[in-house]
Amino acid sequence: MHRNARGNVPGPSSLRQSIGTTKADRDRDRVPSVDAGAPRTPDTTTSSSTTRHMHHQPHPRNGRQERKCTVTVNESFSRDEVLLNLDLFDNGIKPGSLMAIEVPPEKSGHASLRKMPTQDHLDRDDSSMDASQTGSTTTTDRRYLFIVKDMSKDMKLRHPKVELYVAKHVAEAFGMKKGGHVYLIPEDANNPSIEASHVELSFRDQYLSRADMWRMAVGELSERTVYQGQVIYFLGTCKAQISAVFVDGRKVRSAFFGRHTRPIYRSESARYILFIQMSREMWDFDSDGSGEIMFNKVVNGFLPALFKKWMALKLKHLVSIVLFARVEYDTGISTEFAETALHDSYFTGTQKSGSKRPYKDFYRVVVSEKTSVEWTSILYHLKREFGIFRRDISLHHQQALNPMQSVSEEGATKQPYHRQIRAESSLATHGNFLEAINLASTVYAHDYIDRDLMRTGISVVVISPGAGVFEVDYEELRRTTEALVGNGIGIDLICVPKIPLHSVPLFRYKKVPEKGRRHSEKIKTHFHDGSTPKYHTPAIGSYTSALGSSLSPTKNMSVPPRVESSLMSHASNDEWSYALPQWLHVSYWTGNSDEALSYQGIALSASDNTCQDSQDEFAIRCRMYDLQMRSVLETNEIETTPLHADPSFPRKLIQPLPLAKFRRFDVDGITLIPNLRHTGGLVDHVSGFQKFAPDKHAKPGEKTIWRHLQEYDDTKAHLPASRRHLGFRPQNNADNVRMHGVESGSYLGASMISERRVSINHHQSPHPSVSSKTSSGKTPKFMRQISLGQRGFGIAAPKVAVAEVQVENVAAATSMAAVSGSRSPLPVRMTPIKSNPQTSQSPQALTAIRDSPIAERAQESGRSSRLAPSRPIHIRNNVQSSDSTLFGTVGTMISSSVIRHAGAAPDAPEIKYSNALRAEDAQKVGISKLRAGEMPDQQAILSPSAAVSPWLTVLNPCNPEANKVDETNLYSRWQHVFPQPSEMKVMKWKSLCTPAAVPLTTEHFPTQAQFDSEYQRQPYNVSQEFDDELTEEPKTREELLKELISLRFSQGFQVVVGQAVAKAFGQKQMKIADILSRDHSAEDGTSIFLSVGNTIHQLSCVNGTEVEVNIFTRKPALQASNLEQPEVYKPAIRTIMDEDYVARQIDIATPKPERNWNYIDSYVAGHDLELSESFRFWRARFVLIPIVNRTSLDPAAGEKEEETRIEGTRRLGKLWQKHRYIPPSDRRFQDLGPRHRKDPNPLDIVYKTDDPSVVIAAELETLPLLEGLEAGHRRAQLVTNKHQFRKSSLNLAQLAEAIQQPVENGGVRMQNRRWHLRLHYNCFIGSDMIDWMLDNFEDLDSREEAEALGNVLMISDEDKLKDKEKDKDKEKDKDKEKEGSTRRESGIFVHVEKRHRFKDGQYFYQISSDFAKPQPSTWFNQRWREASVPSTPISEQPPRESIRNSISHTLSEEESLTSGATTPTAPILPYGGNKPRVMLSKVMKYDVDHRKRSYRPERIDLHYDRLHNPDNCYHLRIDWMNVTAKLIEDAVEGWAREASLYGMRLVEVPIAEACTISDVNPFRKPFPIKLAVPPPDRQPVTFYDPTSFSPLAQPARLFYQKAILRKFDFVLDMESASSFPSNVDVTYSWGKPEFKYTQYIHRSGILLAEITDEGDFLILANRLYSNRAQAARDKEMRKEEEQQQHKHRQGGAGAGGNGGLPGHSHVADLTPLSSPLFRAVNTTGSPKTAGQGAAGAGSHGNNIAPGGEHNVHSALIKFSLDEPNSIRLEMEKFCHDPVALEAFYSELLDRAPGPQPASSIMAPTIISQTGSGTGPVADHNIPSFPSGGLPQGLLSSSVAGDGLSVIPSPVQQRVQSPAVLAASQLLRRGSVQY
């Protein structure tokens, strides 16, 4: 059943709702029905439709082959949805064939079926389907399609009598009952009635790139049956649900997903930004409706309805709401002096029309990225802001201009001038509508940076009190259009008033004069009220409103010819154009129902099939008082129906002549081309006749024009007997060939061919086009133009095209074979056209137009498409003389185009061409007064009109015509989102609830004329990288092509389908690959076209293995010289935390740099390239934030929190190392080590207890990160004894000797190592020893075995006891010698504090004194110049820039210009050279698909820290291109789960620092906090040198500010670039340090903080924090914390074991957000002493800052449960309290102890004898942590962790003195040095 036979079908809403049938639908109507038996060729696409039409309805049941079967429901899980026992069926059913299951209706007679649990959710907003779609439930709603699959033999044995085996979820969805009867019906897969035209899928809580969508459609949907409610799993992890299935616009339950099916993806977890235009009308009353204030309609009507919809559908959107307005200022003086008298820097600009007042734009952020569940608080904030918004923006200029104005001398009696300025909000029409959209596009223009892996989709909704008409600036419109057509942002406009009577949305802009045109060329022509533009017409759809005339252009049409030049040149200054944008879609809030939005895309007259009510029951709306008093005028010019639009008008008078009757005459050298254009009616002159004599030249037997007109008048004079409604009748004159000439003083320009198929006609007969061929092989100088039909879009007046060709121009495919009749499907390779300066006086170029073979074949083909001749277009370089082209006056056209041959006679007799003029006169009946526009010169840049023409449909809004709106152009990118034609006037909420992604396909493609003249080409070839034998299984060319397509999908490209491509290349058919087919082959000659914005990519398979890429780029737009649009936009923005509006300068004019696609494609092809910024690759940064664990993984091990975090980092490193991808080129080096390094050391992270800048400044010589020290590959050198060791035969002496060899000789690195304040001499770390043993033992295969062997080599506890006994029994020399030998056989090394066994990790060990080599006498004060080189995986190399610029690791001889007080400077080493380069991070290739779920490589670049302080954040960064995002999210969630087990929280944070957020998002700004009292100059002594034993005074900057941040639980995130030594080249694997300020992050991860150079704080919420995996864990942790808090309060632990410190153990135990910096260290029982002791931690980072009376405890509990604003308010309160600050400063100074004797603690010993019962040990391997954060079993353990000092028991804590505590607090260094 044809869709047009149905009534008006109100279809479901969509984000981009079409206005009529699509071009594909109309094309389908003309395509013959598809033969069911015809073979399917997925790799060949003709110029026919892309979506097949439903030509057949299913036959009646009694006429089909069907079988009644009994259903058996499979209750268990099964991958197969339907199985058949083919042994019980005849041979007619084959596996793989398509069948349908029809469920008979229920006995009650009702066809309602039982829905799945999710069905209500899917159908909730599909309630307006009419009866034609929902009535036939027996064949539609209860009909399930499936592909036949036979049961297995085992199942047949178990269930021999089962015929039909159906999965449970399918049975429930379609109402199949166990044991019930259904009908099996064979189906044909090629039948269009069962192939889905659109399939809609919804998903949430994940980021799906468009490349993932394409792969999901091909992998899980293509060539399969689908049904509503079906859940799709792609790669086992990407989940989506089919929410709707459409067959030819009809909603069905099940269908077949074929090659023409278009998938639509909708996100249920997107980002929404709502703009509310607070124009003057927002405070007006709704006089036409309810009478309430407009804003109340928004906040009480629309928004609650929207949020309730979201809640009902359980959507998870993030919402931001911005109020915006434009304030105009009445200065009281003339406009010329307004900006100069005042300060023009304050104003944003000046209105270009109307009052021309200066104005300023305001933006108020009310809500910033709140979840949609908080909609009640959102509405509260909106209502509160409404009360003060108008006041704030109206009075802002008084405060802003006050310091700029000077009071006059009479100031005592006269007010300042700025107070006399009257500020008033502008009307919605003159508001900052485009500017707001432009700002929104800049917010999401860089969504590939800081990629949120939890959300997909961006939608911008603008709510306006206007009617949808906006007066804009042309340059702003062009810039916004170019920005929006290249991204996937959807813009929805919601208007509050009623629907207007004209087309909307409408942009009204002033005409931009063409650059460099003569005065005569600037004459603009007038257009009929239905006229709309072509691409090349500068006066597109314009009409004059000058001199106060009517908006209708026809009143100026009576100006005599050649008289109106001056008038029109003056009128052109005020000429306006009206345009419908394809990227903006409008709805109207009626307020009558929560269920509907009135929709208006184009005026109702533009609908091709409007309903009867809209025509007969016209609702009169008029707000003009005079017209209300006089009643509405019955007739006016706009409402009068044009004569030829009357159904009874003789159509054939205005239809084009057939090809056979298309007369041409060549008389005396003059070629006459009949003008088939409809000329202007009343003032068009007919050349050749002195008087109108229609019958003079009539042929015998032919009815004259006069007879036709007489019959028409007679018909109209008699009233019909009965009135009947005549609907839309398709016309057959759409493909008229219109040609006209131009005047010239010397010779006439070339005639142009202009034709365009009408876009909405459903039936059109093919009409041949007039083509040409050259006589001498040279191509004529012709330019094609496009006309959009008979009425409304106008005809372009031609002129000879001239251009300065500076780049390669695109020519249509030159195909001589096509001219000669060849039908080769391959496009001819395009070659650049080299233009030479020449004139166009060649007679060959002006040959008469003749019929071409293409035109003849076009007549036979049955296509109504535009067929262009296969010839290139040559462009001349010379600039044509001004007299060569001159436009005639308005309404005057030469009747025929006369092309003069060289030397032809200037005049010709009238009788010679009267027959030609007779055909011309037939086209000159009194029809609609069409005018012609001028055609601009073809230049290297586009004219202003051509720049926006593809994306803006320009027309007369008051009377657009139905057959002139081509939605392929109007909704080019969003066309395939619309499953149904929008004949309804009510849309639903789908677009506002679930925004759709940009479709994968489009039919929009430039015409051949545009393609030839407006595009330039860049070709290159891409081939797969084959690296000899090292390459893994090479990709095929098909796989490479898929990767190239996938990459472009993710960058916003769409695949061009349909006939437009073949048309543009002048061919009937092209070999186009089918991207939605599973088994399409990439043969030579196959092409794929992809487009985005003004860029087109053609991917072609060539040369057997290569892919040729042709990039077609549209020429840049012409920048008009008279534009005064500033390059910098200057609005006033008030963010959510600002107190007032702040003037901002935003660059919205600079375009984004173009990508280097050649480089990108080479990267995808496998060439060893690095990601660069031009790639626009996806990236995200994560930090592991230390938190306080409540339990340990292994309580028996006695590990503490810092030790646990180090272990967690090591475990993550092992995980990364396990799934690390090693390129084949590096694999050969990886195999050089002994036994190929079976178990490499994970990442070799260097752990320090200082910040990176301090470590680099103090320990540069021994730092193992210097570039150049790692190139030697330590493991390539083995021990010097030429053989390896074995576990079975160990010689400890030889082993100890080998271990202590120098590193270059194969030994283990021994060096002095500092942990906090203790310096351990000549020690090694456990991980280095594990690596060494794996290299030098033959029978060790894993790190676990090496660790076990290390414990064997450790000195045991029994040996320690024996040592003490032997020392007491010295007289037994014999026994002593015997025991000594036993000891030597038991172990060779020991832990530096004799507290732990041997472990793999950051644990310090020393060779025992029995085996240790003696050190030189001067070693004590020597700085070891050896650099420790941990075992880094061999293939991990620094970036190529580092390799290319590798330099010596010596320090620079240049003097540092930076003071040591601000930037630490590394000591100058004795050897000279350039700056040493320190790499603080490494990068590896990580495989996120280690389970091999994907068919393609899924690898990312993982950057990780090499230098880490366990008290700070550990940094990760991931970069990727062309990787499935859900696999990345799964990997990140796995890392987060692993890290949470070891006391760390994985949080995503912005890559850029907090102070630069406004550069990316103008609606966000860090909140500044100033200190009420400046810090004192005096500071505690806190700096220690690694080789000194006494504290050194260093003027640490911002010491007190950092202490305040620690007080509020912030930890170090990233240091500023100035923090590092200036004489060291510090780099990361991703680039140089770029932070201006040092950044900190709250332990919760929800807040960032920076300290400025002035000592102020900048606070910014981390909006990237959204951790779905941790939400449940955090809730569980908080519940546990509450229980522990209750237990502690009952037990009184706060005053006993914890010293009564506020926020100490309570906070550490209660919240995972609390910091180790808040803990007390071994406090005494006295609360007073404890409070003083805790205060000292401000300088060392161990404890909470002073202020026992300040309730930090309660504040921190609030922080963990509330939003970031709570932390900010608490911190702001503290910083603004002078008393609290003074107390804080004084306690920090008073509690800082003096230097302690270094010898008592820092004595140089080989093995420390410090016991656990002698008090706090400050010098230890791993720092101590608060007792409250550890299990009770660990508090009494004497062995608390490897390398850690033991936490004393509560008894030991009570006996310690305050002096000992103060000393311990001082000596333990914090994570941040001051």
Curated annotation (Swiss-Prot):
CDD domains: DEP_DEPDC5-like (cd04449). It is a peripheral membrane protein. It comes from the Eukaryota. Residues 1304-1383 form the DEP domain. Residues 1-68, 106-136, 1363-1386, 1671-1749 are annotated as: Disordered. SMART domains: DEP. Residues 1691-1702 have a biased composition (Gly residues). Its main location: membrane. GO terms for biological process: intracellular signal transduction; negative regulation of TORC1 signaling; positive regulation of autophagy. Keywords: Membrane, Vacuole. GO terms for molecular function: GTPase activator activity. It is found in: Vacuole membrane. Residues 23-32, 117-127, 1671-1685 have a biased composition (Basic and acidic residues). Residues 52-62 have a biased composition (Basic residues). GO terms for cellular component: GATOR1 complex; vacuolar membrane. PANTHER family: DEP DOMAIN CONTAINING PROTEIN 5, GATOR COMPLEX PROTEIN DEPDC5. This is Vacuolar membrane-associated protein IML1. The gene is IML1.
